[in-house]
């Protein structure tokens, strides 16, 4: 049986490594992207991604934009990570779902 594929997207390599190491230990295959544009490209190039772990604040294309692009074609589960603490930011952006 093939392992489930998880895409981890974060512009900080330490954060990607932390999440990747945890997921690999749990038996997942991990695909990495370091910015939003790369994430969208990799998502549509790769078959069968089961979950996306997505940073909100990134260069080129932020996590909310990535989510909007992917939602046009897929309902893959997405976990959003953020260092933002302002509840207004969270509530404003959740309308994309």
Regions found by a protein language model. Name each.
Residues 17-25:
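Charged docking surfaces used in two-component/phosphorelay signaling
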Residues 1-7:
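Non-catalytic signal-transmission and effector/linker regions of two-component phosphorelay proteins
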């Amino acid at each position: 049986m093939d392992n489930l594929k998880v895409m981890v997207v974060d512009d900080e390599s330490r954060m990607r490594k932390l999440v990747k190491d945890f997921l690999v230990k749990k038996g997942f295959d991990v695909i990495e992207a370091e910015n939003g544009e790369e994430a969208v490209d990799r998502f549509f190039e790769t078959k069968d991604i089961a979950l996306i772990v997505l940073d909100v604040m990134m260069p080129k294309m932020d996590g909310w934009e990535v989510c909007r692009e992917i939602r046009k074609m897929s309902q893959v589960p997405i976990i959003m990570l953020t260092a933002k603490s302002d509840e207004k930011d969270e509530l404003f952006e959740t309308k994309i779902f």
